[in-house]
Structure formats: C-alpha cells, structure tokens
C-alpha cells in the first residue's frame, strides 16, 4: 500500500466501504497521507502516511527523527490523522542512538514519547513497544493509557516549525499539554490561561537532570495550577514534557 496511484487509492476506498458495510473500523497503515476519506467514511480512524517510529528499527543515526517530529505538526498533520506509532520505552539521547531491529529505541527522551500522544492527532493510537518493556515502566505506561484519542478542544500554545511545539488538548473536563523540542535544549513557559477559574491538580512528566545523556531519565511530580499560572519547564536536547490537568 506504499503508493498513491489511482489503483491503490481506489482500493482504499473499496476497503473503507466494505468495512463500513460490516461495521468495522479501519486503520490504513502503510498508506499515503489522508485527503478527506475519513469524512466520507468515519469508520476510517487513522492513516500512516508518515515516516513513523518503526523506521528507528533500521534507520542509521544520520536520520534525524527528532527534527522530523517537530516538522510534522506543521506539515503532514494538517492533512488529517496520523498513525505515527509512538510510545518507545527505550530512549536514546543524542549520540547514543543506533539501529537495532530486535530491541529498537527512539531518538530523544522518554518524556518526548509521552508528549507525542498529545502533540500528534491519532484517533486510533497504539503502544509500539513490547509488553515486557511496558510492565517495567508502570508510571509511563499508566500515563499513556489515560490519554484520550479524540478531543473536544485543541490549542497550539507555542511553536516554531522545525524547532519546538507545545499543544494543549481537552477531553471533557481534563486537559493534556504536550511539548517537544529539536536537539536544542530549551526552557518552555506554559501559559495556563486556557483553564477555567479554579485550582486544578496536575501531573507532570518532564525530562530528568540526566536526560541529555540518558534518554530514559525523567521526573514525575504533582503540581497545582490556576489560569494565571505560568509553568517553567526545561526540555533536554530531543526532549519533551507531558502534563495532565484535572
């Protein structure tokens, strides 16, 4: 399906129609970017059409997935849902990544992987790593498992294509905020003025003190925020943060 010619496009539409007939959902992985099919067939939940995380199983270190990630919200994501397959628990800081098909790793930090579930729109999300790795990481796994896949409201709080982005999304009364950076470490200020007029409890996953050399390093903390709060968060090179507010 890795093509976008007339025959393949026609096949995708036939598959969507057949799945709708039998009340099945469809994830078109290995296909081209969406162009409105999910409006005609709402049972089509996701499309790949992206150089997703699976590429890290075989891509050389010269492939800069971190830079690519901060391009996607401004380019590919505009066309519709994206089956990027995030969620790696083996995370390599700059200079430590190498391709490994049997035990693949992501470029960048653990918190970057958590943030991608918020930054990228993906109504049919997945966990890309092995069950044993998730069992070893109950804090990260538990946080990912709670993140909704569809949203009532989305706001881009800050960003610059190819450098960084911070996105807030609401499901019901719960907000999630995710931020990622390129290989440049940076300090982000999250303006919480999008919140209502009360005090909220928040869970924050952010890059640990050693995340610049050990991508798995993170810090988890509970904070209280209001709509006049401005959270200052440091992002390691290739880093990120994920925040749940309720």
PLM feature spans:
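Aromatic- and carboxylate-enriched substrate-binding clefts and catalytic-loop regions
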Residues: 1-105
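Acidic/polar loop patches that form or flank catalytic/metal-binding clefts of enzymes
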Residues: 23-30, 53-57, 123-137, 151-155, ...
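Conserved, mostly hydrophobic/aromatic
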Residues: 26, 119, 177, 238
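Catalytic domains of carbohydrate-active enzymes that cleave complex glycans
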Residues: 103, 112-124, 128-131
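Glycan-recognition and catalytic regions of carbohydrate-active enzymes
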Residues: 129-176, 180, 212-216
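Carbohydrate-binding surface patches
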Residues: 161-201, 241-242
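Solvent-exposed beta-strand/loop surfaces of large extracellular or lumenal domains
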Residues: 204-228
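C-terminal beta-strand-rich structural cap/linker in extracellular carbohydrate-active enzymes
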Residues: 222-246
